[in-house]
Structure formats: structure tokens, C-alpha cells
């Protein structure tokens, strides 16, 4: 029973690895070697050229061009959100204090009693 189970697991893993190794991505490179290549091209023998190529490489994400305008706007939004948060906290505090005052004023002479023992 164990031999059958282990052989099934081995064949399943072998099948999975073979499918992953032959799986092609959108760019035509195998899925497992998509990132950093093990053996890079030999055209970058000079270190300075390699660094310049890496600096000029286009990445998948886009860098925002209007960061000078976006930062002050974000700062203003942050300040407004902080003011709104403070107002919300103040309103919550006033509501809870009003509710607590209402509870205490409605039963000022009541004492907590358990069976025949009152505190």
C-alpha cells in the first residue's frame, strides 16, 4: 500500500515539475527562469555599461511624473482627515458622556442589590 502511494506521489510531482518547466509565459521564456537569468548575455562585459543598462531599464510599474504636485495635495488630505478624526472622537465622547449622565440621573437613589444584600 505504501509503495503504491509513494509511487503515485512521485509520478505526480514529476508531472507537475515537467509541466512547470515547459510552461511558457507571455514573453516566450520558461516560467521558472523568468526572473534573474542564471547565465546572462555576454554583451554586458563592462560594469559601467551594465549599471547604465540597469538604470535605464523600463520596469513594469510607472513612476508618477507629478510627484511635486501630489505630495502637497496628499498632505492637505491628511490634515483634513486628522481634523475629521478629532471631530468624530469629540462627538463620540460627548455622546457617551451624555448617555452616562442620563443613566446616572434617571436612578440616583437606586442601589445595587443581590438577593437581600444591598451595597
UniProtKB/Swiss-Prot annotation:
Family of this protein: Belongs to the urotensin-2 family.
Protein name: Urotensin-2B
Keyword Signal (UniProt): yes
GO BP: blood vessel diameter maintenance; regulation of blood pressure
GO MF annotations, alphabetized: G protein-coupled receptor binding; hormone activity
Superkingdom of the organism of origin: Eukaryota
GO terms under cellular component: extracellular region
Secretion signal, residue range per the UniProt entry: 1-28
Propeptide feature: residues: 29-109
Subcellular location: Secreted
Keyword annotations from UniProtKB, A to Z: Cleavage on pair of basic residues, Disulfide bond, Hormone, Secreted, Signal
Organism: Homo sapiens (Human)
Function description: Potent vasoconstrictor.
Listed InterPro entries: U-IIB, Urotensin_II
The UniProt record lists the keyword Protein biosynthesis: no
Gene: UTS2B
Main location class: secreted
Disulfide bridge partners, by residue number: 113-118
Amino acid at each position: 500500500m505504501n509503495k503504491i502511494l509513494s509511487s503515485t506521489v512521485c509520478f505526480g510531482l514529476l508531472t507537475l515539475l515537467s509541466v512547470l518547466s515547459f510552461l511558457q509565459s507571455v514573453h516566450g521564456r520558461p516560467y521558472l527562469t523568468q526572473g534573474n537569468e542564471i547565465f546572462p548575455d555576454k554583451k554586458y562585459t563592462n560594469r559601467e555599461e551594465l549599471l547604465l543598462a540597469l538604470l535605464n531599464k523600463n520596469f513594469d510599474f510607472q513612476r508618477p511624473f507629478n510627484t511635486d504636485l501630489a505630495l502637497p495635495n496628499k498632505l492637505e488630505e491628511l490634515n483634513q482627515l486628522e481634523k475629521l478624526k478629532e471631530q468624530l472622537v469629540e462627538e463620540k465622547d460627548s455622546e457617551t458622556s451624555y448617555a452616562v449622565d442620563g443613566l446616572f440621573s434617571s436612578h440616583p437613589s437606586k442601589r445595587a442589590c443581590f438577593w437581600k444584600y444591598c451595597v
